[in-house]
């Protein structure tokens, strides 16, 4: 069963909301449902993971694993990895509470050219690489679980699944 991470779990000092943390389906949705972190809120998962330097290091280590894995490396063969790392950092900063807004594409749009070739097998490989990376960097099991719950909440959009189907398969 997938954990549903409530916004209050990730940002306890910000007024709790009832919606689970989800990757935005649009920029408007992102800004409408996600309050901005403040300097008074050092408890975001982004901060707990070590902030900018730690998350950048995690992104670098994560993509080293991804491009070495034949299961998923094919999706990055024509990708400028410097640009990809920058996009991933920006998304994680937003999703983990370290940035007030996400200015990138929604997850469905960002991954649409990969579908139908992108499957749950690929999604799970990427999740595993991120989880392994965080563990190798000394992140606590609880914080890894919270981060993985945020990542899992993007599955429906990344794989372009009908929203109801994705909600059921994430449980």
Swiss-Prot record:
Heme binds at residues 63, 111. Binds 1 heme group per subunit. One of its GO terms (cellular component) is chloroplast. SUPFAM superfamilies: Globin-like. It is found in: Plastid, Chloroplast. InterPro entries: Globin-like_sf, Globin/Proto, Globin_bac-like_CS, Hemoglobin_trunc. Its cofactor is heme. Residues 1-23 form a transit peptide. Keywords: Chloroplast, Heme, Iron, Metal-binding, Oxygen transport, Plastid, Transit peptide, Transport. The keyword Iron applies. GO terms for molecular function: heme binding; metal ion binding; oxygen binding; oxygen carrier activity. The keyword Transit peptide applies. Induction: By light. PROSITE patterns: GLOBIN_FAM_2. Belongs to the truncated hemoglobin family. Group I subfamily. This is Group 1 truncated hemoglobin LI410. It comes from Chlamydomonas moewusii (Chlamydomonas eugametos).
